[in-house]
């Protein structure tokens, strides 16, 4: 949990509001009470008074075990982080006049990236007068995409960017 979120949570004596809309430990609405009354009620059951909605008028406070509440929040954050998937974009560089063996080697590397779940940017850099024959580069990229069509989909068709032409491949969704 970030330090900002910790500092913003108002508990027990750190509550600044004079009146609070109080919710009991089992979730029932108790009503609007003064801060002093709410604190006494929380102390009677050996729990904390925690403000859960500070922007409401009056602020909403709940009688609960703050340690348990904090632990549950941290657990939820960890679950959210686990569900997030980081997608890397790996780049493979080819030339318009690439030989077959070199092409197969680059293809093998690209397939490895795609099976791991990474996206793959296949680019061709045109040097010198080779830029006049863009169709050769486009054929190489289309051949690459065709060889990977069983494990990848074309996310972006061949496109020129300065002296480079590239294609984006994304792994197909697993069933």
From Swiss-Prot:
Q: According to the lineage, what is the superkingdom?
A: Bacteria
Q: Which GO terms describe its biological process?
A: ribosome disassembly
Mind listing the UniProt keywords for this protein, alphabetically?
Answer: Cytoplasm, Initiation factor, Protein biosynthesis
Q: Where is the signal peptide?
A: none
UniProt cross-references to SUPFAM superfamilies, sorted A to Z: Translation initiation factor IF3, C-terminal domain (SSF55200), Translation initiation factor IF3, N-terminal domain (SSF54364)
Whether ATP-binding counts among this entry's keywords is no
Localization per record: Cytoplasm
Q: Does the keyword Cell inner membrane apply?
A: no
Question: Where would you say this protein principally sits, based on its record?
Answer: cytoplasm
Alphabetical GO CC annotations of the entry are: cytosol
Question: Which is one GO molecular function term here?
Answer: ribosome binding
Of which family is this protein a member? Belongs to the IF-3 family.
Subunit and partners: Monomer.
Described function: IF-3 binds to the 30S ribosomal subunit and shifts the equilibrium between 70S ribosomes and their 50S and 30S subunits in favor of the free subunits, thus enhancing the availability of 30S subunits on which protein synthesis initiation begins.
For this entry, the protein name equals Translation initiation factor IF-3
Q: Identify the species of origin.
A: Staphylococcus aureus (strain NCTC 8325 / PS 47)
Q: Provide the gene name from the record.
A: infC
